[in-house]
């Protein structure tokens, strides 16, 4: 009898199960879009091609549809910043640029308190809270041969910086 139950449990078929949030995930996060996208067959989900808006789609002329390697949405969160605009303040592609044009003067700086280890304002802080993977054990012991090129955090324990400021939208 246990073999019968074991066979039924293993042979369960959930391919017809649909959740209410499936369409949301497909539209916003490209989950379940295509097996080719996640299998690495010529398209790496972490590559630049998956984060650049399709120039043909912008004009309504993309013939590839779902098979296109580029984004078919104008989502600012997924677009990488334009290197030329960030460096020079202008881009020769102008409005047709496939990358995000961020104004360097409006960029938010890194929070000095968070870099020291803890920011008392937490999510309402005005600065960026950039995580480093973990403290470098060699640096904590006294010396890290990699210096600033070390992938781990080198915490700076100095006098506290100026008091952190709250975000304007809070």
From Swiss-Prot:
The keyword Nucleus applies. GO terms for molecular function: RNA binding; zinc ion binding. Keywords: Metal-binding, mRNA processing, Nucleus, Repeat, RNA-binding, Zinc, Zinc-finger. PROSITE patterns: ZF_C3H1. One of its GO terms (cellular component) is nucleus. GO terms for biological process: co-transcriptional mRNA 3'-end processing, cleavage and polyadenylation pathway. Disulfide bonds: none annotated. It is found in: Nucleus. A zinc finger (C3H1-type) spans 48-75, 76-104, 105-130, 131-157. Its main location: nucleus. The keyword rRNA processing does not apply. Belongs to the CPSF4/YTH1 family. Component of the cleavage factor I (CF I) involved in pre-mRNA 3'-end processing. This is mRNA 3'-end-processing protein yth1. It comes from Schizosaccharomyces pombe (strain 972 / ATCC 24843).
């Amino acid at each position: 009898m246990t073999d019968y139950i074991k066979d039924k449990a293993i042979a369960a078929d959930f391919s017809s199960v649909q959740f209410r949030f499936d369409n949301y995930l497909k539209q916003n996060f490209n989950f379940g879009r295509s097996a080719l996208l996640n299998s690495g067959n010529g398209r790496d989900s972490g590559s630049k091609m998956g984060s650049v808006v399709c120039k043909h789609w912008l004009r309504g002329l993309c013939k590839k549809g779902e098979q296109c390697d580029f984004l078919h949405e104008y989502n600012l969160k997924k677009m990488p910043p334009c290197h030329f605009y960030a460096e020079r303040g202008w881009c020769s592609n102008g409005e047709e640029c496939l990358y995000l044009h961020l104004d360097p003067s409006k960029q938010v700086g890194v929070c000095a308190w968070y870099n020291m280890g803890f920011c008392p304002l937490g999510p309402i802080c005005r600065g960026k809270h950039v995580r480093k993977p973990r403290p470098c054990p060699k640096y904590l012991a006294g010396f890290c041969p990699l210096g600033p090129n070390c992938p781990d955090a080198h915490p700076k324990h100095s006098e506290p910086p100026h008091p952190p400021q709250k975000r304007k939208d809070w």
